[in-house]
């Protein structure tokens, strides 16, 4: 307890000795948000709910684009166990329940189409996410602000999801999936950055787990919603997820607070202090007393402006973002690929997806423990090695017909992939300053999506060699996770706002380590 209070003591004394000197915004934020209040929690939940609806759009095709079950009508030429329905007359068989609109496959008559056409909606969704990641990353961090970007992203995603109800063929549906992918490509980025910039260093590991938990709850709720509407049209599932998402985006617009760090960086000190007052009403008096000691706007405007291109021009930034993207590519393959490949283990699809979602919940308890007890690098490295080994062993157990053990190992691999993503998301926030943090986080999620885009093709390998895709995902997670050894350690460090501050602190840390 004494150690946690020690850093505040000299700062307080220094402020008392010279109350006329400028005070850094980082010190003001850290002190005013040193306690975690109920208003902070409500703001985190409000923003974090965007990830709930985002996760539903990511995994919704598991149910809407599934191959429906069918039965024979003419048993003289049809056998459910051996017959290929593409080689017998349409009158000899029918979909279970006699309902053609249960799935995209049945409604658009894709049962005998190529695998490319059947997987086109999922593929265009990921392509849209990749294109959106590139295009939206070009928007400067200082243009609209964290809150406005999150609102536009969530609202566009929900509006397009509702429009899918009007799609009449696979091409229109695939185009709308592309638009959804484009719109939601940076939803997680905007939400994570907005939350992390409104919290102190002390509470960051725990607070940033809230939106991730809500992401998983979205995944879990999707399984429940899909089960409840399993006898209705697949389009109903889009309405059940998109309409609440649209309502939530309106709540974001009216009730979510902007990032105080971003406001300060834009020279809007008055607005930044007002946000801090609303987040932490108990420290209103302290904030009013120190607001006049912040650097004025004209001083802030003298600092250099940065954009995403600087992540590739500045040597240390390029090195970090490259390493992060390599690690996230491997984690993305496992995180998105394992739920797709689980059908090769021959378990109930509703049960398997629900269990995969439930397995994620403990990760939000484990992740803060790892962040508080161990270094960032070692946590990422060991987690990736364990997760990769689980994936490879899952493949081996499947070859020997040990279905239950293989499924348990699949859950273990998915568990580690989720922890890895949690760790890297917080790690990246600490690796880059406020002026490029949005852009850097976009690159992280871009690598995650590119890894996910490879999954449908890799998962299809399991149809020829049972569960081979698990071995591929396992080797990717372990092998690419080794690059964590090349990243600098950031445990216990506060966030920087400019590139200059980041460089000065990194240099100071190098000097202290060499002494």
Curated annotation (Swiss-Prot):
The lineage of its organism: Eukaryota, Viridiplantae, Streptophyta, Embryophyta, Tracheophyta. It is a multi-pass membrane protein. The chain crosses the membrane at residues 44-64, 125-145, 150-172, 178-195, 209-229, 236-256, 321-341, 351-371, 380-400, 412-432, 442-462, 468-488. GO terms for molecular function: ATP binding; transmembrane transporter activity. Induction: During drought, cold and salt stress treatments. High affinity carnitine transporter involved in the active cellular uptake of carnitine. Also transports organic cations. Residues 1-43, 146-149, 196-208, 257-320, 372-379, 433-441, 489-515 are cytoplasmic. Residues 65-124, 173-177, 230-235, 342-350, 401-411, 463-467 are extracellular. ATP binds at residues 195-202. One of its GO terms (cellular component) is mitochondrion. GO terms for biological process: cellular response to cold; cellular response to salt stress; cellular response to water deprivation; monoatomic ion transport. Pfam families: Sugar_tr. It is found in: Vacuole membrane. InterPro entries: MFS_dom (IPR020846), MFS_sugar_transport-like (IPR005828), MFS_trans_sf (IPR036259). It comes from Arabidopsis thaliana. This is Organic cation/carnitine transporter 5. Mostly expressed in leaves and siliques, and, to a lower extent, in roots, stems and flowers. Gene3D superfamilies: MFS general substrate transporter like domains (1.20.1250.20). Keywords: ATP-binding, Ion transport, Membrane, Nucleotide-binding, Transmembrane, Transmembrane helix, Transport, Vacuole. PROSITE patterns: MFS (PS50850). The gene is OCT5. Belongs to the major facilitator (TC 2.A.1) superfamily. Organic cation transporter (TC 2.A.1.19) family.
